């Protein structure tokens, strides 16, 4: 039977998992075990859901760690002077390398609602870093329209931010 798993459903599932894993009253653990070879077709074997298989899994664990906090993340896109950003479009699937959100130097995250254009209608580079935490969309002097999304706290940055990824809210 075919199933449609939409991006919205995937996000809902991830949100539920994050909520469960961040619930300190019911701790979650992650385990690492030995690797086992699969068949030559690189297809994972179907679990048998037996007590024997569960025991074999537990015996192959090499370490476990209690999860203390988790966060969803997205690729980190630092706002850079002279970069062309694209306005968010809910009709587009998969943005590829087109950036439509930015992280500023004070860890505020903004979404680009409309890219700046010149008189000929060509996209122009962003030259004014968005700032402020008002929830209303605003236009910067370079013609870009931005909307503030959230700010990443220092604690969240230390825990979840890397050079490649940043936490979401």
Positions of predicted regions on the chain:
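Tryptophan-rich substrate-binding surfaces of secreted polymer-degrading and adhesive proteins
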Residues: 1-169
